[in-house]
Every structure is written in structure tokens, then in C-alpha cells.
């Protein structure tokens, strides 16, 4: 093979660089340690060959595409992440931390307080919400340390109202002793005198004429006469023959 028949290969390289900011949790490291470079290399073997008609040396071009991605730490992302971590919308920070209240591993909330007299913690129980546990802690704190104790919620002070009750003292009187006029309750006397009459004393049986109604004829019964045998002697002997004759 002659020297002129050896093809000439020409390599060309095209580099495209892109900077990409990413968040990294390793804030203690320097920026140089955090920076990374990702290279994507693609060689185009089907590049167009260039040749002349006079039979000169053929030059073959091979293109090499290189894409570089620079991974750089983003300070903005770190700041946003910190702000999101302390955002009040998050479930963790939305719950306020109460004094004497901690969450158990299974989810419930426990309340406990340190007793200054005994020098140890007193268990107050577990509750469904941290607010309930905080209220129980506040009551125990006021009971142990007084109204000046530090509580989770402001202690409502109720105004004390003094009620004066007037008591009437009564003296018991022994049998046979004199009683005061205040202790003796006299029985009510009748307003009618002995010689007075009741409103209906003068109204006899069937005497309705006092009201203007003449109903005497309504109660008038026919007269009937009885023989002397029936009412002759009040203590006379009973004679059965008298009744027998009447029955006939």
C-alpha cells in the first residue's frame, strides 16, 4: 500500500458546559469539595468524509461531543431549606413545645413535673394532645409552687367576692322558763266573736227565698196520714197482725 492511500483522520471536539446548582446537606465542607463535574462524551463515527477529485489524500473527520455539567452548591437552596424547616406550616414546628410535656414513641403526650419538696419528678399521665398535657402540668405547677409558678398558659385570676351572711342568734328556752316576745309565735285569733253568726247560719233547709227564688213548691211533699196503730205508743209492743191486715 502506498503512502498516498493511507486515510487521514482528523478529530474535532465540541464541548458544551452547563452549570447546575444543587443542594447539599454537607454544609461543613468547602465549596471546592462539594463541586463536582459530570462529563458526557459522544463520538460520532459517521461524520462526513471530505475528499477531492484529483485523488489526493482522503481526510476523515471524527467529531467528539463532550457535555460538561458542573454541579455547584446552591446557597439559595440552603437558605430556602432552612426557612422551610422553620416554617410554621410544617407539622413538626406547628406544634408548640410546652413545658413539662414530651411525646411518647407511640404518639401520645406525657406530662410530668419536678416536685421541689421531694426533689424528684412526678408523673402526671399521658394524654391525646399536647394541650391537654400542658393544662395538667399548669395545675400541678400552681399547686406545688403557688400562683407565681411558670406555666404554659396564663393563669386566670378570679376575683374573690366576700359575701356577708347575717345570722340571727336564737336562744333556746328551757321548759318552764320565760320566752321572749320574738321567740313566741302567737296563734292567729278568729275574727268572729262568740255572738256573731256565720254567713249561712240564718239560711235553713230549702229557704232559698233569701235570694229571691220561690222554690218552696218544688220541695213540698203530699201529706199522708197514718193510723194510730203506727204511732200510738212509742214503746208499745210490736204486733205482727197489724201488718198482716194491711198486706191483705
UniProtKB/Swiss-Prot annotation:
Pfam families: AP2
SMART domains in the cross-refs: AP2
PANTHER family (alphabetical): PATHOGENESIS-RELATED GENES TRANSCRIPTIONAL ACTIVATOR PTI6, SHN SHINE , DNA BINDING / TRANSCRIPTION FACTOR
Task performed by this protein: Acts as a transcriptional activator. Binds to the GCC-box pathogenesis-related promoter element. Activates the defense genes of plants.
Presence of the UniProt keyword Transcription in the record: yes
Subunit annotation: Interacts with the Pto kinase.
The protein, known as: Pathogenesis-related genes transcriptional activator PTI6
Record feature DNA-binding region, as residue ranges: 97-154
Places the protein is found: Nucleus
Predominant subcellular localization, coarse grouping: nucleus
Keyword Nucleus (UniProt): yes
Organism: Solanum lycopersicum (Tomato)
The entry's keywords: Activator, DNA-binding, Nucleus, Plant defense, Transcription, Transcription regulation
Cellular component terms (Gene Ontology): nucleus
Domain of life: Eukaryota
InterPro entries to which the protein is assigned, alphabetical: AP2/ERF-transcript_factor (IPR017392), AP2/ERF_dom (IPR001471), AP2/ERF_dom_sf (IPR036955), AP2/ERF_ERF_subfamily (IPR050913), DNA-bd_dom_sf (IPR016177)
UniProt record, GO biological process: defense response
A GO molecular-function descriptor: DNA binding
Amino acid at each position: 500500500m502506498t503512502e498516498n492511500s493511507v486515510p487521514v483522520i482528523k478529530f474535532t471536539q465540541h464541548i458544551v458546559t452547563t452549570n447546575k446548582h444543587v443542594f447539599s446537606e454537607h454544609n461543613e465542607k468547602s465549596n471546592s469539595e462539594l463541586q463536582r463535574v459530570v462529563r458526557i462524551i459522544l463520538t460520532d463515527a459517521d461524520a462526513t468524509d471530505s475528499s477531492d477529485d484529483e485523488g489526493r489524500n482522503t481526510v476523515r473527520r471524527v467529531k467528539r461531543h463532550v457535555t460538561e455539567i458542573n454541579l455547584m452548591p446552591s446557597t439559595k437552596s440552603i437558605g430556602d431549606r432552612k426557612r422551610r424547616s422553620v416554617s410554621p406550616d410544617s407539622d413538626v414546628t406547628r406544634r408548640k413545645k410546652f413545658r413539662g410535656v414530651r411525646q411518647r414513641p407511640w404518639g401520645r403526650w406525657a406530662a410530668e413535673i419536678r416536685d421541689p419538696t421531694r426533689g424528684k419528678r412526678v408523673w402526671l399521665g399521658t394524654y391525646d394532645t399536647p394541650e391537654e398535657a400542658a393544662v395538667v402540668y399548669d395545675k400541678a405547677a400552681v399547686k406545688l409552687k403557688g400562683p407565681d409558678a411558670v406555666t404554659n398558659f396564663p393563669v386566670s385570676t378570679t376575683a374573690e367576692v366576700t359575701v356577708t351572711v347575717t345570722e340571727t342568734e336564737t336562744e333556746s328556752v328551757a321548759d318552764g322558763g320565760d320566752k321572749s316576745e320574738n321567740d313566741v309565735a302567737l296563734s292567729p285569733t278568729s275574727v268572729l266573736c262568740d255572738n256573731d253568726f256565720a254567713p249561712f247560719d240564718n239560711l235553713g233547709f230549702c229557704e232559698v227565698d233569701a235570694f229571691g227564688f220561690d222554690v218552696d213548691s218544688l220541695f213540698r211533699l203530699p201529706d199522708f196520714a197514718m193510723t194510730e196503730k203506727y204511732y200510738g205508743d212509742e214503746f208499745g209492743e210490736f204486733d205482727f197482725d197489724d201488718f198482716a191486715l194491711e198486706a191483705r
